[in-house]
């Protein structure tokens, strides 16, 4: 019978060793990969954090690159000190029909929806691609980095404290919104209690 020697070590748990972050985009889109190649170079060769942030955002998933509406972009570009600067969005710019007048804007984005594109250009604005931006301002001077609301997706309404617990405003997953479905106990004072 062989006894374990007292000098044996304990096996180290390696499951937490890896840093979980993207080093490249999941997408196989060749145009996106060319942009990654370009901004990898710029992030390495320039001392600007702008290029590093753009590179990191190019790696992100679609849910982490939410679309930015025209109205939100106009509102953000109206803030003091942002006149004449280029709005940079690593994602899509979408139209907002609630906006009546579009000011003259200089914009750089991965994609611009057709109606948003026509409205920006009609107002005398300019739309750049990221390779044009790299030539225009390689260090990100005169730019404003914007992004859409990441928690704007409907699914975020279901996250948080369990629905039905006190002070919870979490949306329950219900098969139907009828009178008989999660509308009585806990929802009105006459039926037990009201949250």
Swiss-Prot record:
InterPro entries: Ribosomal_eL18, Ribosomal_eL18/eL18-A/B/_CS, Ribosomal_uL15/eL18, Ribosomal_uL15/eL18_sf. GO terms for biological process: cytoplasmic translation. The keyword Cell inner membrane does not apply. There is a cross-link at residues 126, 171 (Glycyl lysine isopeptide (Lys-Gly) (interchain with G-Cter in SUMO2)). Keywords: Cytoplasm, Endoplasmic reticulum, Isopeptide bond, Phosphoprotein, Ribonucleoprotein, Ribosomal protein, Ubl conjugation. The keyword Transport does not apply. Belongs to the eukaryotic ribosomal protein eL18 family. This is Large ribosomal subunit protein eL18. It comes from Sus scrofa. The gene is RPL18.
């Amino acid at each position: 019978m062989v006894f374990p020697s007292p000098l044996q070590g304990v096996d180290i748990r390696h499951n937490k060793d890896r840093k979980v972050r993207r080093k490249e985009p999941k997408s196989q889109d060749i145009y996106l990969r060319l942009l990654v190649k370009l901004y990898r170079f710029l992030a390495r060769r320039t001392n600007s954090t702008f290029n590093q942030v753009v590179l990191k955002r190019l790696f992100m998933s679609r849910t982490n690159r939410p679309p930015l509406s025209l109205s939100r972009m106009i509102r953000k570009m109206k803030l003091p000190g942002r006149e004449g600067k280029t709005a940079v969005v690593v994602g899509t710019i979408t139209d907002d029909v609630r906006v009546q007048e579009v000011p003259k804007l200089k914009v750089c984005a991965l994609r611009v929806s057709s109606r948003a594109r026509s409205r920006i250009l009609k107002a005398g604005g300019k739309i750049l691609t990221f390779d044009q931006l790299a030539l225009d301002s390689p260090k990100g001077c005169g730019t404003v980095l914007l992004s859409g609301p990441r928690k704007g997706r409907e699914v975020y309404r279901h996250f948080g404290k369990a629905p039905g617990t006190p002070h919870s405003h979490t949306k329950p997953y219900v098969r139907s919104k009828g009178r008989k479905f999660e509308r009585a106990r806990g929802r009105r004072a006459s039926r037990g209690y009201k949250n």
